[in-house]
């Protein structure tokens, strides 16, 4: 079951970017803010100066897929905005690099569940 909905409104992005905490790695930045919902809210933002539209869309698809791989391990109730650094060449983006960086950032932000909590869902304990 999908636990995440997308941020769509401009004011939703602004509140996360202004009130949230920032965690950076080489290629991506993640802003995290608590919300009062049982779901995570995800927003992906890439500036128009980062390549052409098809390159930005490809990067968004890669980021979305990386997020869905890590979604079951995340604690619920957060608004998350993911940005790609301006200086990074968007053509060189790879799935493995982004997944690794997202995992590191989520660990630093303490958003990952403990392994016991993850397995309880599958074992019905």
What spans do the regions from the language model cover?
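Positively charged, solvent-exposed patches that mediate nucleic-acid binding
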Residues: 1-125
């Amino acid at each position: 079951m999908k636990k995440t909905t997308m941020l769509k409104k401009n004011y939703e992005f602004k509140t996360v970017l202004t009130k949230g905490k920032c965690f950076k790695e080489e290629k991506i930045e993640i802003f995290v803010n608590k919300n009062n919902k049982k779901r995570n809210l995800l927003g992906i933002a890439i500036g128009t100066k980062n390549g052409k539209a098809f390159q930005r869309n490809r990067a968004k698809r890669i980021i979305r897929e990386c997020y869905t791989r890590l979604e079951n391990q995340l604690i619920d109730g957060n608004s998350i905005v993911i940005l790609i650094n301006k200086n990074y060449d968007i053509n060189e983006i790879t799935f493995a690099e982004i997944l690794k960086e997202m995992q590191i950032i989520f660990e630093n932000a303490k958003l990952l569940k403990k392994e016991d909590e993850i397995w309880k869902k599958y074992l019905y304990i």
